[in-house]
Amino acid sequence: MSEGVDLIDIYADEEFNQDPEFNNTDQIDLYDDVLTATSQPSDDRSSSTEPPPPVRQEPSPKPNNKTPAILYTYSGLRNRRAAVYVGSFSWWTTDQQLIQVIRSIGVYDVVELKFAENRANGQSKGYAEVVVASENSVHKLLELLPGKVLNGEKVDVRPATRQNLSQFEAQARKRECVRVPRGGIPPRAHSRDSSDSADGRATPSENLVPSSARVDKPPSVLPYFNRPPSALPLMGLPPPPIPPPPPLSSSFGVPPPPPGIHYQHLMPPPPRLPPHLAVPPPGAIPPALHLNPAFFPPPNATVGPPPDTYMKASAPYNHHGSRDSGPPPSTVSEAEFEDIMKRNRAISSSAISKAVSGASAGDYSDAIETLLTAIAVIKQSRVANDERCRVLISSLKDCLHGIEAKSYSVGASGSSSRKRHRSRERSPSRSRESSRRHRDLLHNEDRHDDYFQERNREHERHRDRERDRHH
């Protein structure tokens, strides 16, 4: 029978009599030596020369007694993994580099390698969990790996406990706060604050990602949302040359943007146009024209309080006392602005195409008149002071200068030698006079209407002279 409630006698409910000749009272249970001596493990196995201890008569346990407990014993590594935390390395350290350092101390049984990563951007936090196959490897890692240099920094090794995990997490937060960009490329952790979870501390199941999911690639620069404008120099770019733009006026129907958002993709242009925008090719629209002009004032305009209308802040010629050649100030909605700009682009493209075609056919007068008409129409539009309109006008003027130079170089040459002779006599003086007039009038935008009328009279006189010459 069994002793106490800690063990189970598997033969308590049935008799172990295999031969009916033996009497139950005379039977010696071979299992009594084991079951009755559990309190003294050293007496489990008795010598064959010693007589068996007498069978103690004890009452059998009641049927409704307490359920006996089953005991289990385990070895040291059967219930937990052999793992350590390795940290204090740089965020761009790869799993292959870490494994090479581990193998350099004689540990080759690495089972798993998990990097702690930011959930926001997938960047390493600078520590990892290393799982090995034996306790001996754990001792080697704890004794030999600390102090090893990995990417210029000495690694730190600690047992894989919750307390050490919290310490490595705190170190990772401090490193993110004081990290300096290397080579002008800021780490991705600077794209947002170093708070990865609701309670401020990341859990191992959330931040320890298997090494197979890590992709070693150069860091990318993300927009600096939720960061103050002072974080802009971290990008390796010079500070903006002009102050931040004023908020949008109420005439646009759009509320001003929140002050905490920094529009990196809408960086303001430099105060003066670069060389490739000074003389663009005919019909080409220079880059960076997709920016909304409402966010950035023109380069030659003084940044002040929000203007009441769209046009008042961009009138650079009124302080000279001359009349305003632009359209009267008026409010322009965003949809109307885009519609006018689309129409101006179509006018500019059509005029340049027609002028180039006419100049190729030798009809320089019509080509020049077409370009002058397009310039006048765009200047009279309600968004003429916008930077994009000025670029369109500049393209038209460049095309006009090219056609005029070609027309005066050709002159009034015809098929007969007499016409060529008379052209040589008259062309130099007329060419110099007309070129000087064109330069003076084109650079003075306030006299554009007078210039247009003067050009018409000049063309009429030229046609009269040609008609008289033929007659």
UniProtKB/Swiss-Prot annotation:
Region spans: Disordered: 33-69, 176-220, 409-471
Post-translational modification remark: Phosphorylated. Asymmetrically dimethylated on arginine residues by PRMT1.
Intracellular or extracellular location(s): Nucleus; Cytoplasm
Renumbered residue ranges of the record's region Arg/Ser-rich domain: 418-469
Domain of life of the organism encoding this protein: Eukaryota
Domain free text: Contains an Arg/Ser-rich domain composed of arginine-serine dipeptide repeats within the C-terminal region that is necessary and sufficient for activating mRNA 3'-processing.
Protein name: Cleavage and polyadenylation specificity factor subunit 7
Species, as recorded: Homo sapiens (Human)
